[in-house]
Swiss-Prot record:
Post-translational modification: Sumoylated with SUMO1 on multiple lysine residues. Repressor activity is down-regulated upon Ser-669 phosphorylation. Upon neuronal activation dephosphorylated by calcineurin in a Ca2+ dependent manner at Ser-669; dephosphorylation positively affects histone H3.3 loading and transcriptional activation.
Site of covalent link Glycyl lysine isopeptide (Lys-Gly) (interchain with G-Cter in SUMO1): K630
Location relative to the cell: Cytoplasm; Nucleus, Nucleoplasm; Nucleus, PML body; Nucleus, Nucleolus
Organism, scientific name: Mus musculus (Mouse)
Region span, Sumo interaction motif (SIM): 732-739
Compositional bias of kind Basic and acidic residues: 581-595
Chain coiled-coil ranges: 185-223, 364-403, 445-488
Compositionally biased spans, kind Acidic residues: 441-499
The protein's name in its UniProt record: Death domain-associated protein 6
UniProt-annotated stretches for the region Interaction with SPOP: 626-739
Organism classification: Eukaryota, Metazoa, Chordata, Craniata, Vertebrata
């Protein structure tokens, strides 16, 4: 009998819950619960009369719950109207969900409890009204009447079997009552299990709260039975219990989390592939993150099933794009779910304005230190595995390169030697020849492996780019040095216009003359071309080569009419205008510049010509320069007449004695060196230990490269630069014009 009493209490559980609720009035006692033993046995065996009595009592309690639920629902809608005035579609949406819900659920104590809780929390926290609206919508959708219509096709059969004017409402009521009766019998049969599972859920929730409030020591991190792991195990059990409870109650297990939302995918142009990928990422069960292989297999299956006829390379591209898009979408969904569900019951009462770290500086400092420590450790882990990945990729690249070099070996020393000895296009041509031959041999050997060929070509292109960068850097350094010398020449040109020159030491001249052969040895081609214009210096009795002798005689013949007809100023202006196109050729290859300027020193000046005591030109002077012209010999004769003892004093020229002042009009200077004043301007060196030095610069335009060596020797004799170009620009000293 004790068991019968307990069973009766479980059957009338709705009445007990109704009595516990504050809303409805006290219900009349059920006569079946106080009846004698035969009545109990009849109810237990399932006779018809006790069922009718129980049905009448249940119908009365349902009517009371239904009225109370309608009242609470109307109050909630009024609250939603005031709080969601910006979104007027919320209230009609809730009305629609209520109409679609099951009548049994609308008249149940569960719905009454949900409405009471949602209404109380909404009044307490109006800012979270949409959260509670979402909770109510989830419950109403879970108890929607759509599922019950599919399970009861008897209504359609009865309507077909009836006459032309059948009564539609009574059959629907009958089917509803039958469904509710069968549902009640089924739920009553498992009510004991439901009650037991609910008790277990309450026990698990209390234990999880206790473990969350417990402090976790660092020594417990390696403990397999730490409080954190216990909490995780209890949460997994609680999820399984919740799923089982939803099955017994015949309701949906969806809780409205972001992670439960379905992700639509429209990333590709093929609907079949989109459907397959969408089915993959929305697969029920655990939230598993698909990898690239899963996405590729899904794309291949869709292409094979629907005969898309796509090549494998295009399938791989589709899979790569889809994997990136799917990964971003899944990551965003997980991040939002973490934000919405982060924390525990300890953070339920948290408000942004009552953060304890705002009032406690020690706590705020500790939180900042912990955050910094966490970010540093995270960066260390990421950098560690990134370096491991880089090392692995580098090792694979080296193995592949060794394998390629083993199939087609090529010597690597000739390109390096050519890059060191020759600069410019000639050097680059010598470097590109081995690489192109290497590419041809690799194409012949590895025609079947497309990936290896692509990698090899990319590596060759990188090597060529590095070699080109080195060559351009050398050219830029030389151009910068020449520009600095040009700036020094321009400064000295202003001093020459005033009639002053700075003294220079002979050691600088000899040092630069000794460095000249090193510049001349850069390219063999430059040496060969330089040999065409050079005249070796020899004693007076030595025999000269016929070409050099002809060049000297022709140069003298060309120079005499120029000197006799035109003034030095007009000659210089014409030659400067001819040299102007050379400004556009600054960025021309080094090969052309070196071939056209065989005797240029490091600082941009020409070969130093020194005058000895007896007025003759020393034998080492014309090693790399053209022979002196007739005018130059006349100047040295005049200089020789003014020598006094050990001092070298240059007397004024005939033009300055006559009062003629030579001035250079401001013209754009050549790119390699600035043109100084004319050679017959007054120059004076006060130091007795210095020699008279004049430097000539040959800067013909590219159009004059194919002319005869006589014209080049003529230009070398006429173009004069300042003495200051032979020394450092910082060491220029402007002397006074006092006699």
């Amino acid at each position: 009998m004790a068991t019968d009493d307990s069973i009766i209490v479980l059957d009338d559980d709705d009445e007990d819950e109704a009595a516990a609720q504050p809303g409805p009035s006290n219900l009349p006692p059920n006569p079946a619960s106080t009846g004698p033993g035969p009545g109990l046995s009849q109810q237990a065996t399932g006779l018809s009369e006790p069922r009718v009595d129980g049905g009448s009592s249940n119908s009365g309690s349902r009517k009371c719950y239904k009225l109370d639920n309608e009242k609470l629902f109307e109050e909630f809608l009024e609250l939603c109207k005031t709080e969601t005035s910006d979104h007027p579609e919320v209230v009609p949406f809730l009305h629609k969900l209520q109409q679609r819900a099951q009548s049994v659920f609308l008249a149940s104590a569960e719905f009454c409890n949900i409405l009471s809780r949602v209404l109380a929390r909404s009044r307490k926290r109006p800012a979270k009204i949409y959260v509670y609206i979402n909770e109510l919508c989830t419950v109403l959708k879970a108890h929607s009447i759509k599922k019950k219509l599919n399970l009861a096709p008897a209504a359609s059969t009865t309507s077909e079997a009836s006459g032309p004017n059948p009564p539609t409402e009574p059959p629907s009521d009958l089917t509803n009552t039958e469904n509710t009766a069968s549902e009640a019998s089924r739920t009553r049969g498992s009510r004991r299990q439901i009650q037991r599972l609910e008790q277990l859920l309450a026990l698990y929730v209390a234990e999880i709260r206790r473990l969350q409030e417990k402090e976790l020591d660092l020594s417990e991190l390696d403990d397999p039975d730490s409080s954190y792991l216990q909490e995780a195990r209890l949460k997994r059990k609680l999820i399984r219990l919740f799923g089982r409870l939803c099955e017994l109650k015949d309701c949906s297990s969806l809780t409205g989390r972001v992670i439960e939302q379905r992700i639509p995918y429209r990333g590709t142009r093929y609907p079949e592939v989109n459907r397959r990928i969408e089915r993959l990422i929305n697969k029920p069960g655990l939230d598993t993150f698909p990898d690239y292989g899963d996405v590729l297999r899904a794309v291949e299956k869709a292409a094979t099933r629907h005969s898309l006829g796509l090549p494998r390379q295009q399938l791989q591209l589709l899979a790569q794009d889809a994997f990136r898009d799917v990964g971003v979408r899944l990551q965003e969904r997980r991040h939002l779910d973490l934000i919405y569900n982060f924390g525990c019951h300890l953070t339920d009462d948290y408000r942004p304005g009552v953060d304890p770290a705002l009032s406690d500086p020690t706590l705020a400092r500790r939180l900042r230190e912990n955050r910094t420590l966490a970010m540093n450790r995270l960066d260390e882990v990421i950098s560690k595995y990134a370096m491991m990945q880089d090392k692995t990729e580098e090792g694979e690249r080296q193995k592949r390169r060794a394998r390629l070099l083993g199939t087609a070996p090529q010597p690597s020393d000739p390109p390096q030697a050519s890059s060191e000895s020759g600069e410019g296009p000639s050097g680059m041509a010598s470097q590109e020849c081995p690489t192109t031959s290497k590419a041809e041999t690799d194409d012949d050997d590895d025609d079947d492996d497309d990936d290896d060929e692509d990698n090899e070509e990319s590596e060759e292109e990188e090597e060529e780019e590095e070699e080109e960068k080195e060559a351009t850097e050398d050219e830029d350094e030389d151009l910068e040095q020449l520009q600095e010398d040009q700036g020094g020449d321009e400064e000295e040109e202003g001093g020459d216009n005033e009639g002053n020159e700075s003294p220079t030491s002979p050691s600088d001249f000899f040092h630069r003359r000794n460095s000249e052969p090193a510049e001349g040895l850069r390219t063999p081609e430059g040496q060969q071309k330089r040999g065409l214009t050079e005249t070796p210096a020899s004693p007076p009795g030595a025999s000269l080569d016929p070409p050099s002798t002809d060049a000297e005689s022709s140069g003298e013949q060309l120079l005499e009419p120029l000197l006799g007809d035109e003034s030095p100023v007009s000659q210089l202006a014409e030659l400067e205008m001819e040299a102007l196109p050379e400004e556009r050729d600054i960025s021309s290859p080094r090969k052309k510049s070196e071939d056209s300027l065989p005797t240029i020193l490091e600082n941009g000046a020409a070969v130093v010509t020194s005058t000895s005591v007896n007025g003759r030109v020393s034998s080492h002077t014309w090693r790399d320069a053209s022979p002196p012209s007739k005018r130059f010999r006349k100047e040295k004769k005049q200089l020789g007449s003014g020598l006094l003892g050990n001092s070298y004093i240059k007397e004024p020229m005939a033009q300055q004695d006559s009062g003629q002042n030579t001035s250079v009009q401001p013209m754009p200077s050549p790119p390699l060196a600035s043109v100084a004043s004319v050679a017959d301007s007054s120059t004076r060196v006060d130091s007795p230990s210095h020699e008279l030095v004049t430097s000539s610069l040959c800067s013909p335009s590219p159009s004059l490269l194919l002319q005869t060596p006589q014209a080049q020797s003529l230009r070398q004799c006429i173009y004069k630069t300042s003495v200051a170009t032979q020394c450092d620009p910082e060491e220029i000293i402007v002397l006074s014009d006092s006699d």
